[in-house]
């Protein structure tokens, strides 16, 4: 599933082609995604694009009359292509742009979403979200206070969007490894020093992944069709049974909240 770095990579890739241009109309070949494509998107006509933003794993395209909210789901990707590019089987939505390009949404598993909001304050999917991990609001003081008396294992807790947004399965495993914290520990057991290290590590891991264009494990592509390269630097995620690059012990796997967690018991405590 595309996580925060992949969504931010997509945002940065499509922004120069959209802002200042006009969306002439939308082509929707299959409206049956996770939720049906909003009627307002089906009816788009000559809408100037004011900005392209991100909140958590949602892309936010600001138009004069409202916002397109895009979630990439499990397998979605966005590409900028010449308008005449023929659609293939899993190409479900195109936004036709005034510069002769299209923004094409491809999603083999159709678990993404294209929604509409008159303003972001009224959007149900954006309500109750925690702070952005790369923002000044996400501090050690904030996370330490949130963690007190929490018995949930720290890996699962970090993936709660009410605590912090965008730290999905890959980056939770990688951040906990880099911070030296066992993912099976209760969130409330972490010391202030460990929380400080964890916050710094989450920010560093996410920033580095964005610099590498995200992580391509299955379907994610950047807006230019190229893969993300952070997968080549993964320390534990997806490496169960392989040797830890730091200590040489075997990487283990466990299930937390029905998600696979990867860790090194020697390097993490």
UniProtKB/Swiss-Prot annotation:
It holds the Pfam family H2TH. InterPro entries: DNA_glyclase/AP_lyase_DNA-bd, DNA_glyclase_Znf_dom_DNA_BS, Formamido-pyr_DNA_Glyclase, FPG_cat, MutM-like_N-ter, Ribosomal_uS13-like_H2TH, Znf_DNA_glyclase/AP_lyase, Znf_FPG/IleRS. The keyword Zinc applies. Keywords: DNA damage, DNA repair, DNA-binding, Glycosidase, Hydrolase, Lyase, Metal-binding, Multifunctional enzyme, Zinc, Zinc-finger. One of its GO terms (biological process) is base-excision repair. Involved in base excision repair of DNA damaged by oxidation or by mutagenic agents. Acts as a DNA glycosylase that recognizes and removes damaged bases. Has a preference for oxidized purines, such as 7,8-dihydro-8-oxoguanine (8-oxoG). Has AP (apurinic/apyrimidinic) lyase activity and introduces nicks in the DNA strand. Cleaves the DNA backbone by beta-delta elimination to generate a single-strand break at the site of the removed base with both 3'- and 5'-phosphates. The gene is mutM. SMART domains: Fapy_DNA_glyco (SM00898), H2TH (SM01232). The active site is at 2 (schiff-base intermediate with dna), 3 (proton donor), 57 (proton donor), 259 (proton donor). A zinc finger (FPG-type) spans 235-269. It catalyses: Hydrolysis of DNA containing ring-opened 7-methylguanine residues, releasing 2,6-diamino-4-hydroxy-5-(N-methyl)formamidopyrimidine; 2'-deoxyribonucleotide-(2'-deoxyribose 5'-phosphate)-2'-deoxyribonucleotide-DNA = a 3'-end 2'-deoxyribonucleotide-(2,3-dehydro-2,3-deoxyribose 5'-phosphate)-DNA + a 5'-end 5'-phospho-2'-deoxyribonucleoside-DNA + H(+). This is Formamidopyrimidine-DNA glycosylase. Monomer. Belongs to the FPG family. Its EC number is 3.2.2.23, 4.2.99.18. Binds 1 zinc ion per subunit. DNA binds at residues 90, 109, 150. Signal peptide: none annotated. Its cofactor is Zn(2+). The keyword rRNA processing does not apply. One of its GO terms (molecular function) is damaged DNA binding.
């Amino acid at each position: 599933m595309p996580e925060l770095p992949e969504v931010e990579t997509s945002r940065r890739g499509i922004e120069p082609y959209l802002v200042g241009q006009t969306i002439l109309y939308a082509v929707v070949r299959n409206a049956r995604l996770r939720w049906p494509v909003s009627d307002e998107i089906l009816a788009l006509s000559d809408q100037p694009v004011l900005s392209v933003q991100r909140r958590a794993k949602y892309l936010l395209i600001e138009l004069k009359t409202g916002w397109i909210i895009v979630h990439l789901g499990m397998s979605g990707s966005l590409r900028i292509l010449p308008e005449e590019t023929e659609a293939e089987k899993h190409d479900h939505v195109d936004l036709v742009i005034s510069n002769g390009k299209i923004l094409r949404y491809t999603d083999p598993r159709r678990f993404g979403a294209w929604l509409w909001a008159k303003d972001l304050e009224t959007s149900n999917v954006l309500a109750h979200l925690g702070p952005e991990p790369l923002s000044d609001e996400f501090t050690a003081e904030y996370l330490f206070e949130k963690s007190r008396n929490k018995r949930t294992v720290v890996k699962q807790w970090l993936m709660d969007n009410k605590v912090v947004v965008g730290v999905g399965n890959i980056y939770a495993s990688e951040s906990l490894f880099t911070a030296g914290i066992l993912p099976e520990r209760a969130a409330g057991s972490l010391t202030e020093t460990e929380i400080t290290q964890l916050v710094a590590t989450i920010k560093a891991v996410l920033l580095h992944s964005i610099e590498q264009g995200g992580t391509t494990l299955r379907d994610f592509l950047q807006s230019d069709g190229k893969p993300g390269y952070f997968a080549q630097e993964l320390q534990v995620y997806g490496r169960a049974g392989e040797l830890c690059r730091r200590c040489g012990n075997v990487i283990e796997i466990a299930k937390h909240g029905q998600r696979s967690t990867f860790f090194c018991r020697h390097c993490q405590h």
